[in-house]
Swiss-Prot record:
This is Octanoyltransferase. It comes from the Bacteria. Keywords: Acyltransferase, Cytoplasm, Transferase. Pathway: Protein modification; protein lipoylation via endogenous pathway; protein N(6)-(lipoyl)lysine from octanoyl-[acyl-carrier-protein]: step 1/2. It catalyses: octanoyl-[ACP] + L-lysyl-[protein] = N(6)-octanoyl-L-lysyl-[protein] + holo-[ACP] + H(+). One of its GO terms (cellular component) is cytoplasm. The keyword Cytoplasm applies.
């Protein structure tokens, strides 16, 4: 069984990491169900295990070093953070590349509900859209596993302040832009996105 948690208030980043670490230990001990946590963070940057100082253009916001995969990314209001704590071993899916591809398929299927056509890129992990001939990232992935239990996850741009990305080179990729569901001309309440995320989740996971 997968539990779903939706947090309405902005969640402190360090608190979120501690929460996930506690939860995955409980999942490992069979004392808790798997969890999908939908939330938003206050404006900040996170630096994954591959991050380098060269990817910081200007320190506009606080930077948090974290153990997830990837480089620098932005989190803030209007961005739907999706943290997944899933036991891949119990699901007989001990394949990290398969898991990442399934995350991509999930988000692509969600975006179709908004008439947005995303594409998963294995060489530039995440979901991208073609915006008038320009490739722009709409969802960033950063995951970590412990004893084949996942944590961290996806940052899907719903309606964030995209100007905050100017302080970093997102995911270490120069020459590419970022976009959001709102930026692509879609007006919808956040709860609609959450409902679609849940509906499409069970078709893949």
């Amino acid at each position: 069984m997968v539990e779903w948690l939706i947090s309405d208030q902005l969640i402190n980043y360090n608190y979120a990491v501690k929460f996930m670490e506690k939860k995955i230990q409980q999942i490992h001990n069979n004392s808790s169900d798997e969890l999908v946590w939908l939330l938003q963070h206050p404006p900040l940057y996170t630096a994954g295990i591959s991050a380098t100082d060269d990817d910081v253009v200007e320190k506009l916001l606080p930077i948090y070093k974290t153990g997830r995969g990837g480089k620098y990314t932005y989190h803030g209001p209007g961005q739907r953070i999706i943290y997944l704590m899933l036991n891949l071993k119990k699901r007989n899916k001990c394949d990290i590349k398969l898991y990442i591809r399934e995350l991509g398929s999930w988000i692509i299927n969600v975006l179709k509900h908004f008439n947005i056509f995303g594409e998963f890129k294995e060489d530039r992990i995440g979901v991208w859209v073609n915006n008038n001939g320009v490739e722009e990232k709409i969802a960033a992935f950063g995951i970590r596993l412990r004893k084949w239990i996942t944590y961290h996850g996806i940052a899907l741009n719903f309606s964030p302040d995209l100007s905050h990305y100017k302080g970093i080179i997102p995911c270490g990729l120069k020459g590419y832009g970022v976009t959001s569901i709102k930026e692509l001309g879609v007006k919808a309440p956040l709860f609609k996105l959450d409902n679609i995320l849940k509906k499409e989740f069970y078709k893949i996971f």
